[in-house]
Amino acid sequence: EHATIVDLLRNDMSLVAKNITLKRYQIYEELTAHKKITGQMSSWIQGDLPTNYRSQIGDIIYKMLPAGSISGAPKPKTTALIKDIEKKPRGYYTGISGYFDGDNLDSAVLIRFLEADGSYRCGGGITHKSVLTSEYQELIQKIYVPIF
């Protein structure tokens, strides 16, 4: 699953940057919250933005959304399917939050977070090899850490 997500994100980055490289792959961390441990897998992907990226940061972000890790592939088809299946807008869910200080962008895709009204949404990735019961257990585990 992680390899698929990395490939999707490399493709997203290729829309806005050149010389895309995978700097670090499958960094595993254990996160602890309220005496519960969950595993987190991440990778670092890097590319060269255009020299005038500061004036284009909004367009750059827009071109990359929704993140391939959310939509899957092929993105135009999967986003159309999601829109047809989900009858109400996602709001902030699966968007991004972060800041741009003029040089650096630090952001995260909002897949597990609390809304101001106290509602909570959570998602997970599936592939054609996914096992429904395993995916459900992973979802429960990932919900548990931030809520409890």
Where are these regions (language model features)?
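Short, mixed-charge, low-aromatic patches
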Residues: 1, 26-32, 96-99
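A conserved active-site cap/scaffold subdomain adjacent to cofactor or substrate pockets
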Residues: 1-14
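Generic beta-strand/beta-sheet core signal
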Residues: 6, 25, 121-123
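Short helix/loop capping segments that flank catalytic or ligand/cofactor-binding pockets
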Residues: 13-16, 129-131
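Metal-dependent phosphodiester-processing active-site neighborhood
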Residues: 15-39
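Conserved hydrophobic core element of enzyme catalytic domains
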Residues: 36-148
